[in-house]
């Protein structure tokens, strides 16, 4: 769970009664490991945006930005849905910053927008542009984050259906798509800015080589 800034694990259950924290996520100051999975559907705090639930590994992007001046920064989250990393960026930049969260799939963008509204920071704009369109803001963003669409080997552990969707052809298509996205992302990044690239892959071959 992410979003309980300044709290200690022992107090999480006092602040949010539906949760029991087993400890902190080592690489995310606002992240907590949950002792069990509660029924989020019935938790009013979850629906109010008091916290967001995501894999601990997804919160590692915050560690990558340590030492990068993010307060007041402009961040482009180019492949943003469902919004877990977007909420983290929104917290990092503060009210004086801006996060542009882009998702080309309108159905997924709707989920993204809902999560952004719940988070309530007021510094996120959700767009549904192709990468080349949103990246026409050349050299404008301080940070560009690409959580690239991939062949999804990292999902095998928690989603058995993902194994059946895997194919060599899908890997090749994803690699080509990633290459296009990265080239556009680079255009949008200001000189001296920070580019974050992540996938849920177990192998290096589907990722761009140049």
Positions of predicted regions on the chain:
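Mobile active-site "lid"/loop adjacent to the S-adenosyl-L-methionine
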Residues: 107, 146-183, 201-202
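Conserved class I S-adenosyl-L-methionine
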Residues: 72-79
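Helix-to-beta-strand junctions that scaffold the AdoMet/dcAdoMet cofactor pocket
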Residues: 94, 189-190
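S-adenosyl-L-methionine
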Residues: 113-136
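A short acidic, Gly/Pro-enriched loop at the edge of an enzyme's catalytic core
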Residues: 136-143
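N-terminal auxiliary segments of SAM/dcSAM-dependent transferases
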Residues: 1-31
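Conserved small/polar residues in nucleotide/adenosyl-binding loops
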Residues: 203-210
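Conserved SAM-binding loop of SAM-dependent methyltransferases across substrates and taxa
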Residues: 82-94
